[in-house]
Structures are given as structure tokens and as C-alpha cells.
Amino acid sequence: MGLEVKLDASKLESWASQLSARGMRNAIRRAVDKSASAARKVALDIIAKDAGVSVARIKPGVTKLRRTTQTDLSASFTATKLRIGILETKGASVGAGGLRASTHRLTGGGSASLNIANAFVVRMANGARFVAFRKSKSRLPIKGVYAEMPSTAMGQDRAAARVAWQKEAEKQLAQRLPQEVQKQLLSEGLPYSPPADTGE
């Protein structure tokens, strides 16, 4: 997910005219990086809740923030197709009656029961395990049951995590950009005059 936000920059125009081009770019970079980092944390929390697992379990499926550069003022991260076993979700269990679990959806229809009567646990030689069920009466093939992937949680239109990311990014950048421009003005030894209070 890349940081693309809209904000009213008219109050910054007089400051920007006083700053060096490099100084202004550095101020923007700091504001974007900090805003994107804060928004990513919010997105991680929503993705975890959407899948019904802990944030720690989701983190390996979300890349670290790709920060801005002198030639690229965008910041982004990627939600991957990390597979998380259904048994790692809250309340999931496999017993004589098969799998009893829930889908934890903040997007769309919300949470729902997920019951598979003929599900069983497969234990691997390395100690790993996953829930599976047979697709037919034959011994093979079997199909694994997994929680929602991070890429799904972020990729859907109007996904809760995507909406939260965008909202937080916009709020953070609106706050941080004026602060970083002010810092840059002071570092360049230029006088700082706050914008007029319009009552907004």
C-alpha cells in the first residue's frame, strides 16, 4: 500500500517559498515517512483483527515500510499471501465433530461460523501442523484450511484495513507536514510565522 493522501497545502505556500528546494523536500520526506509508519501500525492491528489472530502473527506477512528517497516521495508497504493455519485463529478447534471455527471479518458480512465435519489435523515431520479435509472419498487429495491472508484483508475494495490506513495516513500527514516544514525553517535559520487563524 502506498501513501497517497489529499490535504490543503495553501497555508504552507508562504513557508515553502522561503525554504530551499532540498530543505522542502527533506521536510516532506520526514512527514511522509512518519505518517506512513504510524498508519502502517494501525493497518497491522486491523488486519490481525480481520483474520482473528495476533498482530505478531500477522507481521511476517506485511513488509517493512519502504521509505521515501530524494527522487521518490512515496512510502509504501506490501501485504503478502502469508498462510496462517486456521487453528491459530481465536476459538478454533478440531475434535470428533471436525473443525469448529469462525471467520473474523471486519469487512463485508462480518464474522461467521466455519464448521467442517470431516476436518482433521495433519502433523508434519518438522512439528508443524495444519487442518485439512478430503475433497473426495479417496485418500488424496486433501485441502488445507487457513485464515484470511494479509493480502486479502488489504486488497478488497473498501476493506476495513485499507480504509483505516488511508484515514490514519491523511490525519498524520495533515499534522506532521506543517511541523516538519517549521523544523526545516528553523534549521535553515529562517524566521517562522504561523499561518493566520481562520477559525477552521
Residues covered by each model-derived region:
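Short, Lys/Arg-rich flexible segments
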Residues: 1-200
